Amino acid sequence: MPKKQQHYKTIVLSDIHLGSKWSKTKEVTHFLKQHSCDTLILCGDIIDGWSLMRGKNSKWRRRHTNFIKVLLDISHDTKIIYVRGNHDDFLDRVIPLTFSNISVVKDYIYTSGDKRYYVLHGDVFDKVTSSMSWLAKVGDVGYSFLLWANKIYNRRRLKKGLPYYSIAREIKLKVKASVSYISDFEKHIVDIAGKKGCQGVICGHIHYPEKKMIGNVLYLNSGDWMESLSALTEDYDGNWNVYIEEKALTEVRDSESETVSHTELAV
């Protein structure tokens, strides 16, 4: 395994959607091989059971197995907390479950220093809203088309030496309905965390990485590995950052050695 480039106290990943043809599995596997941590939080939708059940172009591939192997390998030195999401809700049959250094749970309270963070995927929001936006429907035809367009667009950008660019993120920033959905989601999730007596909340679900204060609660969203290629990282001083890959490996060539640049957004 390649030498680690960076070590963190905590890393949070979510919405990898193993089994979906849109999953950037090689990128996230590369990320885990290049970054280590004491605690790895997998914040839901790691495995896309919905896509696997639908079949068609979605199926379990060797690269998905390789990702699981990397998880098992790093679990010898890293505590792994797997919080189930809506696309891997098949885990409801077995949770809570602990084996070796891996725990599979519905939700989790993560304590760092004197702060408590409520960890959940975020699909609980779907149960209280009647406006089921395409943002929450990974299998939706419109969203699939957007991911296809994103792939074609970035393939051309990368041939020109330009960094990865998420079309979906730009749309979410400009479309009123999307902005409203994200805002309502954030407020609801923060409210839940506050009622749990937590100073922060860690979630995923909406494929929109973010770090910001909402009232007295620190809102942290790890984004996804279908379009955003993002994660959350925490250093030993308790500082959180949004990590975003700037290049998609599979858009250039099928290689583990491809250099991947990134940015860390300290908001």
What does each model-identified segment do?
Residues S100-K106, D123, V128-L135, V179, ...:
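Conserved beta-sheet core of the metallophosphoesterase superfamily
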Residues K9-H17, L52-K56, E170-A177:
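Short, basic, glycine/proline-bearing loop/turn elements
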Residues K4-K9, S20-S112:
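Core catalytic region of metal-dependent phosphoesterases/phosphodiesterases
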Residues D15, D45, G85, H121, ...:
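Active-site glycine-centered loops adjacent to acidic/histidine catalytic or metal-binding residues
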Residues P2-I11, Y110-Y118, M213-Y219:
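Beta-strand-turn-beta hairpins that frame and shape the catalytic cleft
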Residues G122-F185:
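Active-site-proximal loop/helix segment associated with metal-binding centers of metalloenzymes
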Residues E251-V267:
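C-terminal regulatory/interaction regions
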Residues I11, I41, I81-V83, Y118, ...:
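Hydrophobic/aromatic beta-strand patches that form the interior of the parallel beta-sheet core
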